[in-house]
C-alpha cells in the first residue's frame, strides 16, 4: 500500500507522531514549510474520559423524530468531520474535526449494555480523547485517500443533575458532570443517515449514572412509529464507517 495521504494542512509528522528533530537539515526545512504556523501558546487538549452510546440508522431523519427530540432545548451545529479509515488503527478513532483540530480517541472498553426497558438497548463505550489544533493552509481539494469526509447537522441538548433530578439545560461551556445528547443528520458519499448519541462527561464514577438517568428521561417518551434502537445499530462513527463504506459522491449533497 502506498503512502497515506492526509487532509489539507495535516503532514505525515502530525499524522504518525514522528519528530522532525532527527531528520536531515534539508528535510527539516521542507517539513517546517509544509506545516501550518500555530501560535506559541497552542497546546494539546485532553478531554478526559467519556462514556458513550450511539445508534446510526439509514435514510433521512424523519420530521416526527426531530419533533420528538424537540421536547428539549437544543443548540444546532453544521460541520464536516474527516475520519482516518486506512490504515485502520484498532482501538483508535482519528478525525479532523470541522477542519480546525485533529482529534484522537482511544477506546477503553465497554462496561456493558445500556437498556431502557421497551425503548432502547445499546452498547456502552468508554473513550479518552486528545485534541491537537492545526490550520489548513488552503481550500479543501476533495476526498483524500484513506480519509472519509462526513457532513453532519447536529441538534445537541445537555442534561445535568440538579436537586437529585436530571434536567435539560441550554448547551454551553461548563465543567460540571453532564450528558450531551445529539440527534445528527449525516451525509456521506451521497447517502443519507441519521444518528442518536449520548455522551457523559465528568468524574469517572458518575459517568454511567449520568448517562442512564439522561437516557431514562429522553426515552420516557418512545420514539415515533414504535422504533426501538437496538444493539445491531449501536456503534461508534469510526466503526460504522469501516463497516459501511457507502458508494457514490458527496457532490451536490
Segments predicted by a language model, with ranges:
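Mixed-charge, glycine-accented linear interaction segment located at domain edges/termini
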Residues: 190-246
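Short, charge-rich patches within N-terminal targeting peptides
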Residues: 27-30
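Hydrophobic, proline/glycine-rich low-complexity stretches
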Residues: 36-45, 50-53, 245-252
